[in-house]
C-alpha cells in the first residue's frame, strides 16, 4: 500500500532567522527615478524636471524596487512544499531621509523573526537601505504568513517590529476620496519601469494557471499609488516630507478598473502629520487596509 502523499505546508524551521539576503547596490540615476514615478503614473513635475532647483525628487516607494533586487538567498534551500501557501501580509517602510537622485543605495535583507499565529507562521524580513557612506536611509519590513504551517519550535526574533501610530478618532465617512484609473497595461508599465517582474502580473496564462481570475496589479504598485494620493491630498504634493508608509494587503486589483483611496483620519503629533487611509478595488473591497502615512507636518 502506498503511503499517503503529504499535504499542506508542513513544518517551518527557524534556522534561517538572523540570516541575510544578498546585498544589491542600485544607482538612483535620473533614468530609473523618472521611470519609477512613471510606473505609477505619478505626474508630479518634481520627479521629472531635472532642471528644477535641487534636482529630481525620488518617490519613496522606489524602496520596493530596491527590496525586490536584493531578495535572493542563494545559499538557502527553498521550502518548495510550503512556498505555495505563503502570502504577503503587510509592509512597514520607514524613511530616515529622502532618497537623492544620483546616489548609490545598497540594500540587504535579514530574516528577523518567525512566530506562530493561528492562521500559520508569520515572518518578518527587514531590508536596510544605506548610502555609500554607510548612512541608513530607509528600512522596509516585508511581512508574510505561510498559511496552515507549524513552527518547529518556539518563536524566534532577533529584532522587534516598531509600534505603529494609533488614531484617537476615526470618522464614519471618509475625509476625502481619490479615484485612480487602472488601465489595461498598468501591470506591464509597473513591471518594466519599477523593475519588478512576476508573470502573474503580466501574463494571463500564468495568472489563471495560478488560480487567479486574470492578471493582477502588484501590491507594491497599489501602495505606491495610494501614497501618491495621500501626498497630493495631505502633504501639498511634497513626497520628500514622507517618513513612513504602513499597510496590509487585502483584495486583488484587476486591470481596467479603479482604485479608490480614502482618507479616514488625520492628526498632528509633535510636528508629525499622520494619515490613516484605505484603498478599495473596483469591487469595493479593501485592497489596502490599515494604511498609515507619516510625514513632516510642514
At which residue positions do the language-model features occur?
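Hot-dog-fold acyl-thioester-processing enzymes
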Residues: 2-88, 151, 155-161, 168-233, ...
Amino acid at each position: 500500500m502506498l503511503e499517503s502523499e503529504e499535504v499542506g505546508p508542513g513544518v517551518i524551521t527557524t534556522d534561517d532567522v538572523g540570516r541575510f539576503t544578498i546585498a544589491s547596490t542600485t544607482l538612483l540615476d535620473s533614468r530609473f527615478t523618472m521611470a519609477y514615478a512613471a510606473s505609477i503614473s505619478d505626474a508630479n513635475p518634481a520627479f521629472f524636471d531635472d532642471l528644477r532647483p535641487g534636482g529630481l525628487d525620488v518617490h519613496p516607494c522606489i524602496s520596493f524596487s530596491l527590496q525586490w533586487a536584493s531578495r535572493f538567498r542563494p545559499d538557502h534551500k527553498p521550502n518548495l512544499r510550503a512556498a505555495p501557501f505563503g502570502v504577503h501580509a503587510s509592509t512597514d517602510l520607514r524613511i530616515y531621509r529622502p532618497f537623492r537622485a544620483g546616489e548609490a543605495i545598497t540594500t540587504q535583507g535579514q530574516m528577523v523573526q518567525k512566530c506562530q499565529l493561528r492562521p500559520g507562521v508569520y515572518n518578518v524580513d527587514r531590508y536596510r537601505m544605506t548610502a555609500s557612506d554607510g548612512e541608513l536611509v530607509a528600512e522596509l519590513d516585508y511581512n508574510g504568513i505561510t498559511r496552515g504551517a507549524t513552527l518547529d519550535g518556539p518563536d524566534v526574533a532577533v529584532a522587534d517590529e516598531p509600534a505603529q501610530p494609533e488614531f484617537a478618532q476615526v470618522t464614519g465617512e471618509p475625509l476625502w476620496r481619490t479615484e485612480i484609473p487602472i488601465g489595461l497595461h498598468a501591470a506591464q508599465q509597473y513591471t518594466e519601469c519599477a523593475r519588478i517582474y512576476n508573470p502573474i502580473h503580466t501574463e494571463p496564462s500564468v495568472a489563471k494557471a495560478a488560480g487567479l481570475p486574470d492578471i493582477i496589479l502588484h501590491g507594491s504598485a497599489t501602495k505606491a499609488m495610494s501614497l501618491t494620493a495621500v501626498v497630493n491630498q495631505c502633504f501639498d504634493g511634497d513626497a520628500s516630507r514622507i517618513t513612513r508608509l504602513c499597510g496590509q494587503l487585502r483584495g486583488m486589483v484587476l486591470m481596467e478598473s479603479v482604485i479608490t483611496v480614502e482618507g479616514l483620519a488625520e492628526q498632528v503629533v509633535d510636528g508629525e502629520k499622520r494619515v490613516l487611509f484605505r484603498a478599495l478595488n473596483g469591487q469595493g473591497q479593501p485592497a489596502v487596509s490599515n494604511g498609515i502615512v507619516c510625514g513632516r507636518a510642514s
